[in-house]
Each structure stands twice: as C-alpha cells, then as structure tokens.
Amino acid sequence: MDFSSILNRDPASIEAKIAEFKSGFNSVFISSLGKNGEVLSSYAPLIQSKHGDFIYISSVADHYENIISNPNNISIMFLEDECAAASPIVRKRLRYKASASKIERDSELFNSVFDEFEAKLGSARAIAQIRAMGDFAMFKLELSTGRAVFGFGKAYDINNGVITQATGANPHNMPHKH
C-alpha cells in the first residue's frame, strides 16, 4: 500500500487512505480497563460489516469482563504487520477510542453480521463452531476520536469524522523531509 500520495494533506485523500488501511484487517488490538483499574491489552476477531465494526469474543477472555464493566473506556488499534513495514520505527497504525454495546445473540443484527463474517472468511468449520458456542458474544464498536500515523510527518487526528494534521506542543524545529 503506497501512502506517499498522502503528502498533499487533502482530507478526502487521507480519509480514503485510512479506510483502505482499516479494510485490510480481520482482527484488532484492544486495550480495556478492568474493575480494578488495570489496563489489559489483547486482540479480537474484527467483523467490518455494512452495519459497522464488531468484535466476537469469549466470556472466558479477560477483556470480556473489562468491556462489560467499562464499555465506554476501550481503545482499539490497527497495526501494520512488522514484516511488511519499511521499518519497525514507522509502522503504519490507526487508533481509536471506542465504546462497545453487546448484541443479542438471537437478534436479526447478530445473524446478519455473522453471515457477513462467514462470507468473508469462508464457511470454515471453525467459524461455524464458534458461532454455535454460547460463551461467545458480539459487541458493536462505536469509534470516536483517533489518530492515523502513516510515517514521519504523516500523523492525523480524527475527531467526529474531521481529519486534521496532528501537531504537538513542542514541534520539531526541522520538519521531516519527505
């Protein structure tokens, strides 16, 4: 994926690159807050549906209880594979604050989203098995503020759908050369 065209800072172009980057993922890193105030990092299968973004996790997973207890205090991250990155220092990444709401298993929404999940990943036996497992739950993620980083000098804040160039309190005296 070539992100060099992002340099023009055109918001529509950047938005398209963010969508393209995000669409390449079937799982997402999750940071969640437990009842005891400790943060847990993990990952979960991601279902990018016409209905939004969903995760499907077991109630045995540590982050399940965290999401139930603190559904409005979640962070998710899409991170470029280290093997595909030009350098481990500048891995492309996309991070969002998120909230989660549990989807009832026997609802039309659950069935529609899971049908999309099966269609995308194929009707592998494992997918059919986890669909039937009663300890798994589906959560819809509502993404809010975030940041996309595509390299040095290519960091963008996302706030209510508005994308702006990220700046810091102590910017470099010498901008990154592209």
Question: Residue locations for each model-derived region?
Answer:
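C-terminal edge-of-domain segments
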Residues: 2-11, 112-120, 124-178
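Residues located in well-ordered beta-strands
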Residues: 29, 97-99, 142
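Well-ordered beta-strand positions in beta-sheet-rich domains
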Residues: 41-43, 93-97, 155-157
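Hydrophobic residues embedded in beta-strands of well-ordered beta-sheets
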Residues: 53-54, 74, 146
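An N-terminal domain-cap segment
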Residues: 2-69
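Short, structured beta-strand-loop surface elements
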Residues: 4, 33, 62-120, 133, ...
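Sequence-level motif detector for i,i+2 pairs with an aromatic at +2
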Residues: 25, 41, 91-93, 136
